Curated annotation (Swiss-Prot):
This is Peptide chain release factor 1. It comes from Rippkaea orientalis (strain PCC 8801 / RF-1). The gene is prfA. Peptide chain release factor 1 directs the termination of translation in response to the peptide chain termination codons UAG and UAA. Methylated by PrmC. Methylation increases the termination efficiency of RF1. Keywords: Cytoplasm, Methylation, Protein biosynthesis.
Length: 370
């Protein structure tokens, strides 16, 4: 690993890890549970990098030794063959460890561990776009279930012919944002709609937004900026729904954002849910402003989450899904059933590769971007 800045960073991580280990061994830390948890969590986040770095150093020493054996083998063909094979294997192992270390050293997205609000809006295509939005709700629900995440529909605007004009899913689980952030953008479908009598293929779209959940400390909202009205709501609650106004219509005046919540059983719960969605939307806007500010520094982008970015086309006639960022095709049937892990992992890998290239080209620029 010739890059001196990477070695310096690894040495710094190793030193920090050792200091945290000593800190955890101090009996005094047990008297402060919050500090104990913070230090333990930080140490755990560095552990894989440190262990990989240790393995890299050991492999490097073994490679030096194997090269010396090969050099000293002289005219012994059997010894030379064995030593040459070991040199080759160790060199390959060292290269793989270097790749892993570079990825581990990439700055982590601070939102990666967060739960999300996933918003799907019908785009161009009329009734067919709403039906398509409903198909995407099902696809993401299936994927979330396969990941052992929990999914809840927290806001919806139903369309007359089926599907949704707009739907918001709350998805909770392990590192939800780290995977689904690559799904933000425009999803285009090409198929013959059920409402089409002539059998012609139509093109419709739906827009997906991925919003990390935030609390009221991260996003503060002035009470005078919101206007809340209530209405009677259908759904859970039995006869109560006909007597009590449980639905909440929240309007955020500065940006004209309207949120309608009916899914909870009480007005208070729907009000809290509407505020939760509003905070996520405002935080998402702030994130996108930050991304726009640095996007000119990036030579290329994968899954930046731009609302206008057409990321994928679902072609029913050819039973094919094309991800335009990857330039790859996938099975339509499997994708619609929520089998999108391969697509997501490919996006993660490509994003890591681009960031590594930026890091190699200019460590200072890469640091600024992240």
């Amino acid at each position: 690993m010739a890059e001196s800045y990477l070695l310096e960073k690894l040495q710094s991580v190793d030193q920090t890890y050792q200091e945290l280990t000593h800190r955890l061994a101090d009996p005094d830390i047990a008297t402060n549970p919050d500090e104990l948890q913070r230090v333990a969590r930080l140490r755990s986040s560095l552990e894989e990098t440190v262990l990989t770095y240790d393995s890299w150093k050991q492999t490097q020493e073994e490679l030096i030794g194997a090269k010396q054996i090969l050099k000293d083998a002289g005219g012994d063909p059997e010894m030379r063959e064995m030593a040459a094979l070991e040199v080759e294997e160790l060199a390959e192992k060292l290269e793989e460890l270097e790749k892993k270390l570079k990825i581990l050293l990439l700055p982590r997205d601070p939102n990666d561990d967060k739960n999300i609000m996933l918003e799907i809006r019908a785009g161009t295509g009329g009734d067919e776009a709403s039906i398509w939005a409903g198909d995407l709700v099902r696809m993401y629900s299936r994927y979330a279930e396969s990941q052992k995440w929990t999914v809840k529909l927290v806001s919806e605007s139903l369309a007359d012919m089926g599907g949704f004009k707009e739907a918001i899913l709350e998805i909770q689980g392990d590192r939800v944002y780290s995977k689904l952030k690559f799904e933000a953008g425009v999803h285009r479908v090409q198929r013959v709609p059920v409402t089409e009598a002539g059998g012609r293929v139509h093109t419709s779209t739906a827009t997906v937004a991925i919003m990390p959940e935030v609390d009221d400390v991260e996003v503060q909202i002035d009470a005078k900026d919101i206007e809340i009205t209530t209405a009677r709501s259908g759904g859970a609650g039995g006869q109560n729904v006909n007597k009590v106004e449980t639905a909440v219509d929240l309007f955020y005046k500065p940006l004209g954002i309207r949120i309608f919540c009916t899914e909870e059983r009480s007005q208070l719960q729907n009000r809290e849910r509407a505020m939760q969605i509003l905070r996520a939307k405002l935080y998402d806007l702030k994130l996108r402003e930050q991304q726009d500010a640095v996007s000119s520094m990036r030579k290329s982008q994968v899954g930046t989450g731009a609302r206008s970015e057409k990321i994928r086309t679902y072609n029913y006639k050819d039973n094919r899904v094309t991800d335009h960022r990857l330039g790859q095709n996938f099975s339509l049937a499997g994708t619609l059933e929520g089998d999108i892990e391969e697509i997501i992992q490919s996006c993660i890998s490509q994003d890591q590769q681009e960031r590594l290239e930026e890091l190699a080209a200019s460590p200072e620029t890469a640091s600024a971007i992240n």
